[in-house]
Design a protein with these regions (language model features):
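Short solvent-exposed loop/turn micro-motifs enriched in small/polar/acidic residues
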Residues: 56-58, 108, 217-220, 226, ...
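Conserved metal-binding segment of the jelly-roll/cupin
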Residues: 74-75, 227-243
Length: 243
């Protein structure tokens, strides 16, 4: 795509194109290189009238091309208002933009429009409560979770799941993992089956049965979405998702 031949131990996972101050793209012509920020300052009409009227003289998006070799972490993006307040609050506390504990690196929200360049699977938002209950009740080891959800709000329920200790995670997940090991190896599990993605993620991320990740439970709570080449999906603020 970009004419580079990556070493086997250094795959190219992401290519970002945009005018974010932290790492703007560059434009190169016969006269040399220029940052996209500088180019747009000198040539704001390049943005187009409609964009300038709505967003001003800044590029209003960041284009990312991803090659997802392994499951990525679950993300949840703030609204514009939340991002602005969070950014200012961390500035007031003196948290540096380069600090690893920093949550808000800028004032912008991060809605995502994703277009599949090939066959692609992702997690997109919570299923309905009825769908979650049906999924949990279909698996004996997850029925205690269904009982929890029957007495808690989804927010309380999800917080408890994500804070579960290893013993609890083992009680929930190990029976499923053990029962599906052979069907998974034989290619007998459908890709819309959350059990498949639990086994796949453990294999891809080298997750050991004695060190389970609470995020594995999310395969039973979120919508598993399949996109074909050329199809797209929108992740608005507040929608948990993972590629």
């Amino acid at each position: 795509l970009i004419g580079l031949h990556s070493a086997k131990d250094q795959p190219c996972a992401e290519w970002w194109l945009g005018a974010h101050p932290s790492a703007p793209s560059e434009i190169e012509d016969v006269t040399g290189k220029q940052s996209l920020i500088e180019f747009l300052l000198q040539n704001p009409t390049a943005l187009g009238q409609a964009s300038r009227q709505q967003f001003g003289d800044e590029l209003p998006y960041l284009l990312k091309i991803l090659d997802v070799g392994k499951p990525l972490s679950i993300q949840l993006h703030p609204t514009k208002s939340q991002a602005e307040k969070g950014f200012e609050a961390e500035n007031a506390k003196g948290v540096a933009l380069t600090d690893s504990t920093r949550t808000y690196k800028d004032r912008n929200h991060k809605p995502e429009m994703m277009i599949a360049l090939s066959d692609f699977w992702l997690l997109h938002g919570f299923k309905t409560k009825a769908q979650i209950l049906a999924t949990l009740n279909a698996r004996p080891s997850l029925q205690p979770l269904a009982e929890k959800l029957g007495t808690q709000s989804l927010a309380e329920f999800y917080a408890n799941v994500m804070l579960a200790d290893q013993s609890t995670l083992a009680n929930w997940l190990l029976p499923i993992i053990e029962a599906n090991q052979q069907p998974y190896k034989n290619g007998e599990l459908a890709l819309d089956n959350p059990d498949y993605w639990v086994l796949y993620t453990m294999e891809a991320m080298a997750i050991l049965p004695e060190k389970l990740d609470a995020g594995l439970v999310c395969f039973y709570l979120f919508n598993i979405v399949h996109l074909k080449e050329g199809e797209g999906i929108f992740q608005d603020a507040g929608i948990p998702h993972a590629y």
